């Protein structure tokens, strides 16, 4: 029976790590071309912005991505970007030499209802 102890300990640790990731919400994810397409589609379309989102930026690059499964999927893009003065400048930055800062862009997607919404754009901590 002592041979079961290491196996049971491994299972317990795996369960604990899995539970911890679920309880903490967001999970790190490798950025795919589909993720970049979703970011561009939502972030460049001002009508997809929640009315509480007042920041307007363009993004230079995605530094990392975290996702959270809710009643759809929430994407938290950690980006380098620049403030813009016009909705026409949203999306990828046309001016690659702008003065950049770090931002978090949260996008909510629910494919079965065709929902795509920018829920927040905040300076990164």
UniProtKB/Swiss-Prot annotation:
Record localization: Secreted
Site residues by UniProt (Reactive site): 25
Motif window: Secondary area of contact: 68-72
Residues the record marks as carrying a glycan: 45
Swiss-Prot/TrEMBL keywords: Glycoprotein, Protease inhibitor, Secreted, Signal, Thiol protease inhibitor, Virulence
InterPro entries: Cystatin_sf
Gene Ontology CC entries for this record: extracellular region
Major location category of this protein: secreted
Paired cysteines (S-S): none
Cleavable signal peptide: 1-21
Record's keyword annotation contains Signal: yes
Keyword Membrane carried by entry: no
Expression induction or repression: Expression is up-regulated during infection of host tomato.
Molecular-function GO term, any one: peptidase inhibitor activity
Family, per entry: Belongs to the cystatin family.
Protein name: Cystatin-like cysteine protease inhibitor EPIC2A
Protein's organism: Phytophthora infestans (strain T30-4)
């Amino acid at each position: 029976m002592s041979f079961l102890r290491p196996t049971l300990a491994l299972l317990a640790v795996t369960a604990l790590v899995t539970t911890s990731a679920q309880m903490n919400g967001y999970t790190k994810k490798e950025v795919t071309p589909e993720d970049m397409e979703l970011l561009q589609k939502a972030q460049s379309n001002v009508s997809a912005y929640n009315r509480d989102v007042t920041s307007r930026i363009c993004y230079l690059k995605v530094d990392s991505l975290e996702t959270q499964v809710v009643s759809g999927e929430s994407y938290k893009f950690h980006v380098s970007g620049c403030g813009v003065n016009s909705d026409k400048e949203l999306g990828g930055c046309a001016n690659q030499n702008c003065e950049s800062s770090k931002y978090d862009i949260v996008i909510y997607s629910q494919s079965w209802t065709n929902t795509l919404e920018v829920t927040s754009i905040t300076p990164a901590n």
